[in-house]
Every structure is written in structure tokens, then in C-alpha cells.
Amino acid sequence: MVFRPKTIACAVAVASALCAGGASADATQDFYKGKIVRLVNGGAAGSGYDLYSRMLAPWLEKKLGATVIVESRPGAGMMTAMNHTWIQPPDGLTMMLAPGEGAVLSKLVDDHSLRFDFSKYTMIARVNTAPRVMIVYPKGPYHSVSDILNTQKPLQIGSNGKVDGVSDTTAMFCHAMKIPCKITIGYKSSADFALAAIRGEVDGTILVEDSAARYAQGGQLRGVMVMARERSKIMPDVPTIYESVKLSDEAAWWLDFREDVRKIGRVLVGPPGMEPGKLALLRKVTKEILTDPEALKEFAAKQQPALYGEPEEMSGIVNRILGDSLPEARRQEVKRVIMEAYY
């Protein structure tokens, strides 16, 4: 074979580019060795966000060669932690397991207390999404979906804030099914409003399946309804709202809209504008962790199952909800239902 100068030059250029890419990746990996990475947690101690953050941290340490510290900043339905993460340097040393649902809905309803635009966070991966389950005071009047749908007095639900996942799910459910409801906000955490339900101060609450299961398995609260099209894998005996009643098209729209938001789930994010090389590495190692059979087994054993989601898919859902696909009249209706209708 005869090598012409131009061919040799091209081969050298390609080889150089490959070497440079490898060197760049190695340099990014080396950057993390000995560094401190802060994984911000906005949930209360013992909450699902707290547990997921603490399970994820040692796996990230192993992959990055860094020390990963879970930094708790609870408050304001996790928006305190969201605001904090928003203003951190985009140097790859700060991440947060964020409440994607609440963050998107807060933007949708024009919450002016927010300093951030969720669509501009650096999306790393979805860590988990899970159906929400209505759990109730076991000595109360609600034993089935039928009991709830036929209630003559307001169903009383405890929660943290108006877009904390509990209140907004409740509001859209009550609006869809045309039942009287009263949402009491102001509890500091899910543990507090779950305790209120255990005491009978409210009829119940709505939590993601892993949190709901902890209360149901101990007999403190009873699961009556899954707010999704599919049953919970952790609470398989609890029926879904969809299988329990024939829904009108309008009712199905409200429940499906909330389900679409739910798919965003708990997402690992960084501050806006993260350096591409560090972002690529963080996305790579996070995907490796969340698809590793040993990691998945460990998470599941603690009833905190992981369900990896591609960052591009999550960004697509966010942009669809906050973009122009939702007519303005419908957006205003959603805002009214979430922010005003049941308080």
C-alpha cells in the first residue's frame, strides 16, 4: 500500500484528536480526585430525598474519586435548596437531587418567590420516579376509593406547600373528580403531615410509593388509591383511580397532566452552565450507577428503587409543560386549581 502525504496527514490528525479527547476525559476524571463534591438535600431528615441522597453519595465517591458530602438545606418545600443550588458556581462540585415536579409546577403557576428557572438547571439524570399513593387515617371513614369519591364532607389532606407534590396532586384529583376537599398547608415536612394523619388531625395525605409504604406497612396509615395508571410495585394491592372508576375525558386530562409532571420525578441537577467535560462525566457515572445491578439491588432493598431517566428526555418533558403546548386559558385554569380552589 502506498501512503500519500495527504492521507498520512489526515491519519495523524484523527489520531491526535482521539488522543486529545482521551486526555481531556482523563483530565476531567483527575479533576475530581481529592475534591469535595456537595450533594444538596432539600428534604427533611429521613425523607425520601434524604435517603436517596445518602445512598447515592458513596457510589458517586467511588466513581469520581472525590469526597461527596450530603449538605442538608431543608425549607420552603425544598425551594430553599433549589435557590441555593441555582447560585452556586457551575464547576461540577455542586449537585442537588431536585423535586422536578414541584419545581416545574412552581414555574407554571408563577411562584414569584423562586430565584430560578428550572429549565435552565444543568440536567444530569432522573434518579427515580414513582406513583403517588393516597394514605389515610385507618380509623377514619375512608376505606376504599368509593368512600372517597362519594364523600359528602370535605376530604382533609395535610401538606407542606401548594406545589409540594401533595397539594397539587390533591387539588387536581379533587377538581377532576368533583369532590369537596380541604388542603391544610404549613407542615414543615412529609413526616409532620404524615404524623398529622396518624393522629387523625387530617384524613390523610398523598406520598410517593416508597414513603407511603413505610407508613402503611407499619399499620399507621392505610393505602386506598394509587394516583397513576399502573399499580405500585411496592404496594401492589392498592387499586389505581383509573381502574376504580370510569373517567370522563375532562377528568382523565387532569389526572394525566399530573402524571406527565410526575414522570420528571427526582432529578439530579447542577447549577446552570456547567462545563461540558464535567457534565459529560457526571452524566456518564450517574447512568452507570443507576443501571448497575448491585446499586439497583441496594436501593430496592431499602425500598428506595432507582429508575434512571435520560437527561434529554427529562428536559423534553419540562419544556413541553412550560412551553407553548399548553394553551394559556388551560394554564390559568391549572394555576387557579392548584393555588386557590381548595384552601
Predicted regions and their residues:
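Bacterial N-terminal signal peptides that target proteins for export
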Residues: 1-11
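A glycine-rich, hydrophobic loop/mini-helix early in the fold
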Residues: 14
